[in-house]
Swiss-Prot record:
Annotated keywords: DNA-directed RNA polymerase, Nucleotidyltransferase, Transcription, Transferase
Gene Ontology CC, one term: DNA-directed RNA polymerase complex
Role this protein plays: DNA-dependent RNA polymerase catalyzes the transcription of DNA into RNA using the four ribonucleoside triphosphates as substrates.
UniProt family annotation: Belongs to the RNA polymerase beta chain family.
Keyword Iron-sulfur on entry: no
The name this protein goes by in its record: DNA-directed RNA polymerase subunit beta
Record organism: Bordetella pertussis (strain Tohama I / ATCC BAA-589 / NCTC 13251)
CDD domains: RNA_pol_B_RPB2 (cd00653)
Any one Gene Ontology BP term: DNA-templated transcription
Reactions performed catalytically: RNA(n) + a ribonucleoside 5'-triphosphate = RNA(n+1) + diphosphate
Amino acid sequence: MPYSYTEKKRIRKSFAKREDVQNVPFLLATQLQSYLTFLQADTATSDRVNEGLQAAFSSIFPIVSHNGMARLEFVSYALGEPVFDVKECQQRGLTYASPLRAKVRLVLLDREVSKPTIKEVKEQEVYMGEIPLMTGTGSFVINGTERVIVSQLHRSPGVFFEHDRGKTHSSGKLLFSARVIPYRGSWLDFEFDPKDVLFFRVDRRRKMPVTILLKAIGMTPESILAHFFDFDNFELKSEGGMMEFVAERWKGEMARFDIADRDGKVIVEKDKRINAKHLRDLAAGGIQRVSVPEDFLYGRVLAKNIVDPDTGEVVAHANDEITESVLNAMRAANVRDIQTLYTNDLDRGPYISQTLRADETADQMAARVAIYRMMRPGEPPTEEAVEALFQRLFYSEETYDLSRVGRMKVNSRLGRGDDSTGPMTLTNEDILETIKVLVELRNGRGQIDDIDHLGNRRVRCVGELAENQFRAGLVRVERAVKERLGQAETENLMPHDLINSKPISAAIKEFFGSSQLSQFMDQTNPLSEITHKRRVSALGPGGLTRERAGFEVRDVHPTHYGRVCPIETPEGPNIGLINSMALYARLNEYGFLETPYRKIIDGKVSDQIDYLSAIEESHYVIAQANAALDDEGRFVDDLVACREAGETMLTAPGNVHYMDVAPSQIVSVAASLIPFLEHDDANRALMGANMQRQAVPCLRPEKPLVGTGVERTVAVDSGTTVQALRGGVVDHVDADRVVIRVNDEENVAGEVGVDIYNLIKYTRSNQNTNINQRPIVARGDKVAKGDVLADGASTDLGELALGQNMLIAFMPWNGYNFEDSILISERVVADDRYTSIHIEELTVVARDTKLGPEEITRDISNLAETQLNRLDDSGIVYIGAEVSADDVLVGKVTPKGETQLTPEEKLLRAIFGEKASDVKDTSLRVPSGMTGTVIDVQVFTREGIVRDKRAQSIIDDELRRYRQDLNDQLRIVENDQFDRIEKMLVGKTVNGGPRKLAKGATLTKAYLADLDRWQWFDIRLADEQHAVVLEQAKESLEQKRHQFDLAFEEKRKKLTQGDELPPGVLKMIKVYLAVKRRLQPGDKMAGRHGNKGVVSRITPVEDMPHMADGTPADIVLNPLGVPSRMNVGQVLEVHLGWAAKGVGYRIADMLRDERTAQAKSVRGYLEKVYNTTGSSAHIDSLTDEEVLELANNLKKGVPFATPVFDGATEEEIGKMLELAYPDDVAARMRLTASRSQAWLYDGRTGEQFERPVTIGYMHYLKLHHLVDDKMHARSTGPYSLVTQQPLGGKAQFGGQRFGEMEVWALEAYGASYTLQEMLTVKSDDITGRTKVYENIVKGDHVIDAGMPESFNVLVKEIRSLALDMDLERN
C-alpha cells in the first residue's frame, strides 16, 4: 500500500506477525453517528426515519383537545443555521446550537354537523427552542465550554428471570422471580414466596397473588388451571373409581395399592416404587385404565366446576380439594366423569393452584379493583377509573413502551424467534407466557438469566439520551396545549399562541448543562479526549448508583471480549462501573455492543467480516487472532484454542466458525497504546492506561521510539491534527494557516477550488493545557485527501506523542530513587524536554451597581505609576507583558456607598470640591503563585455601550485576518481562472479590443501580458462560442467577488454588533496568561506500564552515571520497582528503545558519507532493519530523495511498533540490538554480550559501578499533577463564619489543619505553650489573634490567649439541647 505524505517521512517498523484484515474503525463514529440519526438535519422531510427528533414529535402529536373538536398535528421540522461558529461560541461563552422550528397544523372541527367535518386548518412554523449541535470531533459547546455526553450502559428492556441465590429465606431455598422491564412505563415483577405461592407486584408496590392479575385480564379459575396444568381423568364408581392410565406419570411413584393387569395378575405390589420394567409390563398388558381405591381420590384437586346435570347447581368448584363429603355430593348428583390436576413433588408443582386458593377476588372486576386499590390507596374506585387505570398500566402506548429492543428481547426469551414484530405494549400472551416460564423454572426446567451478560445490557448513546429529554419537554408542552386547545376556536388562536417552547428549552438545557452524563470534557491531551468520548458508564439517571452496585456488576464478564475493555476503568469507588469501548467495537441497531470476526468457510479463514453481538456470539465457536494459519488460510495445528459460550477450550479446526480480527480486539484505545502490554500485570496495565490520559503536552512533542502502531490512528481521529479535506498543492503556509489549491478532479463545479485551514494557536483547553497547531507541510508539497497538514498538541508528524524518549538507567542512586522516586538529569530541564505551557483564563466583569456603573479605567487612585505601566489607555494590559502575582491586569473601579461626613470634612469638601475617594479599586490582579505572559485579551461590550479603543482594535485585527483569507481565496481562484482564459485566448482571431487591436489580428501571450487582466474581457473574439465562454468567465469571477464581499460584510456585522452578556453586566474582559512550567522536584511522572513516581531531585549532568563514551543517563529509576509489581513490559520497552536509538546512530554514521553512496548504503541498511523480522515495509517504493529524507528523520532513532499481544519477541529484540550495536561499537561503549546492559561510571568519582546496568530508552510522561498547582502557603486569610477557624484548601487560600493527632504529639512532648498558641491565637481566638497582630507590628512578641470561638459554638450546641451552661468568670 502507498504511504501517506507523513508516513513516508518516518516509517514505523512493525513487529506484527500478521497483516491487518481490517483497519481500526473511526474512533468517534458511535457519538457522531448517534447524534446524526437524532437530528436528521440533512435528510429530506419525506425520507426521515422514525428516530430521534422525528420519533419524539410523532409520539406526542397529534394533540387533541378534551372535547375532541380541535387537534394540533405535526407536519415536519427544520433546523436553522447556527448564528456563531464553534470558535466564536467558545470565546463568547455561548452554546453552539441551531434553532429548531416545527411546522404544525391546527385543525378545527365543526360542532354543528353530526359527523366530524373539518371547519378550518391553520398551518404555521413554530419555534421550538435551540438544539445544541455536535462539533466535528464529537463534543458539544455549552456556555462556552466543551462537554461530552457519555454513553450509558443500562439494563435492556425485556423480560428477565432470576433467583435470590437462597439469601432471602433462612432455609436457603431458591426463590425464583421474573421481571418485565419496559423502556418507559411500569415494571411488572413476579416472585415466589417461601411457601411456593406466586405473587406479582407493579412498580415495586405491595405484592398480590398472581391470579388476581390473571383474573383481571379476563381469565376464570377454570381457564387458569387449564393453562398451567395437565389433567388426570377419573370415572367414579360406587366405591373408588377408574383412572385413565398414563405411563410416564407413574414412573418413580410409590404404589399406594396393588396394580394388576387385565387378567388380574399383580404387577406392582402395594408400597413398592414403580420402575421402568413395571411400566413396560403394564404397557405389554395393554392397560388403558386402572382401578383406584377411594382414599386415592382424597386430597386431589378438581380442575373444573362440577355441576349437577339435572338442577344446574354447582356441586364443587374448580381448585377444590376432594374430600369424602365432596365425593358423596358428586355421586348424589349423578356425576360420573371428573378431572383433577396432575401434580407431583418433583417437576410438577401445584403452585398456581395454591395461589388461586390464597386469592379471594371473585371475578374480573373485583380483581381490577384490587389492583386499583394497590396503585391508588385511599381513592374511591369508580368503574371508569378502575378500567382506565388498568388500561394505562400495560396496554396504553402513551404510558407504556417496550421499544423495539424490548419487544425483541421478550420474543426471544419467550421462544418466539429473534425479531421485533408485535405491539410495543404488553399483551395478555406475554404475561401468561412469562408466568409459564417462571413456573417451569421453579419446576426445575430452564435457566435463569445472567444480568451482567452484554446481551442483557445495552448502550444508550447521545442521540437516544437527548431524544428522551426532548420527549420529556414535549410532554410538558402537550399538557399546556391540551388546556389551551379548547379556547383555540373561540379566541381565533394560531399554533404559535398554543405552543410555548420554554419547557423544551429547559429540558434540553438541563440535560446538556447539568445531567450526570454530560461531563466537562477531559482535554488534557488527544488521548484523554478520545477516551472520554468512547466511555461507557453504568451510572447516571436510570442506571446504577455507586453504593448499590455489587461486585458482579463491576467484574469482567466473558461477553466483554472485544466489546468492552477489561483493563481500562478508574481505580476507586467507580471501578468497573465506568468502562471504555474496545478498539473495534460498535453498536448495532438495538444498541447492543458488537465486535467483528472473520468468517471461516469450509475450514478456510476468509476475509469476510461479520459483526456479532454477545447473544449471537454464544452460538459459535471462535478461534483467537493468533492461531497459526498456513498460506491458504487454514489452521496449522490439530487442536485450536477457541471460545464457545464464554468457555475456553481446545477443538479440532473443523468445528471452528469464526476467528478474531486482530489481537488488539479486546482492549481499548488507551490500553492498545501500551507496548508489551502482554508482559504487564493487569493492575499496572490499568494504571498505565489511565495515566496516559493525564500526560501533559510537552513544548516539543516527540514520537515514542517504541509504539504499538495505533498512535497515528488516535492522533488523526481525535481531531487534534489538521487533515486535508481534499487533495491538492500547498499554495501558502505560515504559522497561522495553510492554503491549498485543490486538484481539479476533486473540485466540484461552481465551488471555490481553495481550502484554507486556519490553525488553532495557543488556545486554552478545559484543563488549562495549551492547544497549538504547527504546520508540517511546505509550499509546493502535493498532498492527498486525509493527509496530515498540521500537528496539534501532543502529536509529532501525525502520530500521538504524549511524552519524551529518555535514556533510562535502572540502578539505585544515593537513596534518591527510594520508593518510586525519580532522579533526573539537569540536562532534561535545560533542554526544555518536559517544559509545558499552561494557559490561565482570568475574567473581570464591569457591572451596573445600585450606586452607579463600575468602570474599566487606567485612572485608579492610590496606585503607583509602576503598577500601572503595563496597562494601555483603556486600562487593559498589553499583549506580551510579563506579569507576576498581584500585578494589575485590568484596572476597574467600583462606586462606594456614601458615608456620613463629619462637619470638618464637609467644610473641606465645600472649599476644595469633590474628592475622588468615593470609588474603590476592584481591579483584576494576577492570583497568588502565578507568573506568566499575557498572550491574548478579549473585550466584550454590551449592546448600546461605546467601545473603548482596545475593543475596537481587537475587532479590526480580526477583520483584517478574515479579509486576508478571502483575498487569498480570491487570488487563487482568479489566477486559476485567468490561466484558463489565457490558454483559451492565445492564438485566437479577434474583431477588436483595447489598445487599438485591429480586426482579424491574432492574440499573443506578449499582448495579453501587457494588458491588465480584467481588460482581457474587453477583447471581442471573432468566434461566437469562445466569446460566450469569455463572458461567462467574467460573470462567474464577478459573482465570486460579490459573494466574498457579502461574507465579509456578514462577518463585520457579527463582530460589530454588541455581545450578549449576562444581565447587569456592561463589559467583560478575558485575559489569557501563558505560564511556562518546567520540570521540578515534586512533579509526578510515569511510564506507560503503570510505573509512576515523583521527581525527587534534579542532578547536575556531571554527577549523573554515564557510559563509557561519556553519554550521561537522563533518568535513573529504582530496579526494585519492577519485580514485585510484575510490569516487565517496561524492561522490554527499554531494550527495544535502546535498539531503536542505536539503529538511528548507525544511519547517522552512514549519512556522513558523500551523497551518491549515501542513498545506496542507507537503502541497504534500511531493508535489513525493516524486513528482517515482523511485517515488511515497502522501502523499494520510495525514491532516493524520499529515502534520504526518511533517513534524516530516523537519525534520532527508528520508531518501532510492537502491537498489543502480537509484539516483538525476545529473539527479535536481540536481533535488533545486534543490528544496532555491531561488535566494534559494543566494545567501544562497553556493552555486555546481550547488548542490553552497559558498564556505567559514577559521574562524581569517575569510578566504574560494580556491575553492569540495564540501560535504554523509555517513553516517559509528565503527568498533570504538578507541584506548582499543589504547593500553597498562607499567612493570613479568610476564616469560616461559624467556627472562626481558617478555611482549608488551596482554592480558598486556606491553612493547614492542626488535627487531633498533631495535638496528641504536642501533648506527648509536653509543649504546652506551643499547643495553647496553636489552639487559640493561631486559630479561632478572635480577640487574641487581632492582639497578636498588633503586638507584632509594635515589635512586642507577647501572646495573650483568650477563649476560642469553637468553645462558644460548643456551648451554643449544648444550649440547643436545652441544657443551660454558663461560665463562671473569676
